[in-house]
Amino acid sequence: MFNLRYLFRLVQEFFLRFKLILLVGLIIGVASFFLIRFVAPLLFSGKLEKIGVTGNFHTDNLPTSILGLIVDGLTKVDEAGNVAPALARSWESPDKGKTWIFHLKDGLFWQDGKKVTSKSIVYEFSDVNIERPNDSTLIFKLQNPFSPFPYIVSRPTFKKGLLGTGKWRVSKISLAGSFVQSIVLTEKEGNKKIIRFYPTEERTKIAFKLGEVNAIQDLFNLQPFETWKVAEVKKEISKGRVVTIFFNTQDKFLSEKNLRQALSYAVDKSKFNSEKALSSISPNSWSYNPQVKPYDYDPAKAKKLIEDLPKESKQDLKIKLVTSPVLLSVAESIAKDWEALGIKVIVQVYSGIPSEYQAFLAIYDIPGDP
C-alpha cells in the first residue's frame, strides 16, 4: 500500500513539474499527425487537377482532348487540319489509295515498357485486310480506293488494359453501366488528373460549386462564373464545333427555300457574343471557303422573302424549334426574331437527338478533313 501511494505521488509530482513540457509535446505530436496525414500529400505528391466534362461517353469514344493525353494514332491531325506523323513516321499508297503502307517510328514504347510493334497496334475496320510483314510495317488493303485513309488512322489505338503511348497513363476508370463516370490519369512526375463526367452542363456546374471538380472543360454557358471573383474564366473560340440550326427540308413549310433563307436573315447573330460561323467547315481547314453567303442580319429582306411566299406556304405558318437545355436561351432569342416576322414559334427542350423535327438547334462537332 505504501509503495502504491508513493508511486502515485511520484507520478503526480512529475506531471506537475513537467506539465508545460508535456503539453507542448502533445500539441506538437497532434500537429505532426495532421501535417503528415493531410498537408504532406499536397506538398510532395505532385499537382492534382479535378476536371469536369459534360457528356456521356464510352471507353471507345472519349473526347479527343482526353485521348490525346493518353495515346496516339498512326497519324494525327494538326490545328490546320493537315495529317501529320504520330506513331508512323511515314506512309504511302502504291496504287492510288487502295493499299496503304505505314512505317512505324523507332524507339516507341507502350506505358508498360514494352516496345511498340506492328503486332501490338490494333485497328478494326470492316472490309479492310491488315498485314504485318515485320515489326515496323503495317499494310492496310482496302476494297476500294480511299484517299482520306491517313486521316482515319489518326484515331488513337490502345493496347489491352487501356495502355497508351502518351505522357499520361490511365490508373483507374469507373463505369456507370457502359458509360465512363470518372477516369484517373497519372504521370511519372506524380501529377494526377481526375476527370469526372456529368450528363448535363448544369450538373457539371453544380459539381464545380460543390468542389467535386476545380475546373470545367468546354463550358458553353459561362453563367454564373463570369461574375465570380474566385473563379477564373478563360474564353476560347472552338474551331472544331459550331452552333447551328438544322432545317427539315421534307417539312411542308421548310421545304420552301425562301422561307429557310428568311429565317436565316431574321436571326440577329451579334447578340450571341461569339464569332460567327459561315459554314460547318472549320476556318482552319484547307477546304474552308470564306466566300460563301454570310446571311447577315437583315430583317427587311427576311420580311420581303416571307411576303413573296406562295399563299399556301404562309397559311397557318408555325415552326417548332427543338433544342437541348444548354442552348435554351439561344433558342428563345432566335424564336423572338422569327416571331417578329409574324411566325408562330414553339420552343421545345429535348435531352437527346429528336427523331422528328422541323428546326433543330444543336452543337455540331465538325469532323476532320476527309
Functional labels for PLM-detected ranges:
Residues 19-37:
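Hydrophobic membrane-insertion alpha-helices, especially the h-region
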Residues 174-183, 195-250, 349, 359, ...:
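Extracellular/periplasmic solute-recognition and catalytic clefts
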Residues 90-129, 207:
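Aromatic- and charge-enriched surface segment that lines or borders ligand/interaction sites
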Residues 45-60, 99-102, 139, 168-171, ...:
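Short, well-ordered beta-strand elements
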Residues 135, 141-195, 199-202:
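Gly/Pro-rich hinge or "lid" segments in bacterial periplasmic/extracellular proteins
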Residues 49-95, 103:
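N-terminal lobe/hinge region of extracytoplasmic solute-binding protein
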Residues 339-370:
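Periplasmic binding protein-like
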Residues 255-336, 340-348:
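Append "and occasionally in soluble cytosolic enzymes with long acidic Gly/Pro-rich linkers
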